[in-house]
Curated annotation (Swiss-Prot):
Pfam families given in the database record: UPF0058
PANTHER family xref list: UPF0058 PROTEIN MJ1205 (PTHR42203:SF2)
Protein name (record): UPF0058 protein MTH_224
Native species: Methanothermobacter thermautotrophicus (strain ATCC 29096 / DSM 1053 / JCM 10044 / NBRC 100330 / Delta H)
InterPro entries on file: UPF0058 (IPR002753), UPF0058_sf (IPR036519)
Record family assignment: Belongs to the UPF0058 family.
Transmembrane feature ranges: none
Superkingdom field: Archaea
Length: 102
């Protein structure tokens, strides 16, 4: 996926989060995403950073939806997205280490 496509996906997920904000308390689930301080408008950030933000945000959204009463979201979806966020974080850390070594 190209960086501009990732930024568009990131923006879409932010819209989904804003929609969910009206009906749910989202603060706890989104704490990690908010602490990243990476928004879709930060086009200077790397593709890997946006990818990480997308996975963290997707994981938070899935946790919010899983918590909803009567929701049939399987737990493996939430777990899978959390695992993808964890792997993506490792990529960002490696990239930052390479940049610092230069």
């Amino acid at each position: 996926m190209y960086k501009d496509e990732m930024i568009q996906l990131h923006q879409f997920l932010v819209y989904v989060l804003k929609y969910l904000e009206n009906g749910y308390d989202i603060k706890d689930e989104c704490e990690e995403y908010f602490s990243l301080n990476i928004s879709p408008h930060h086009i200077h950030r790397t593709k890997a950073e946006h990818k990480y933000a997308i996975f963290v945000l997707s994981s938070a959204i899935s946790e919010i939806l899983a918590r909803k009463e009567g929701n049939n979201l399987p737990p493996n979806v939430v777990n899978g997205l959390s695992e993808l966020a964890r792997r993506s974080r490792k990529e960002v850390v490696k990239m930052e280490a390479r940049l610092e070594a230069k």
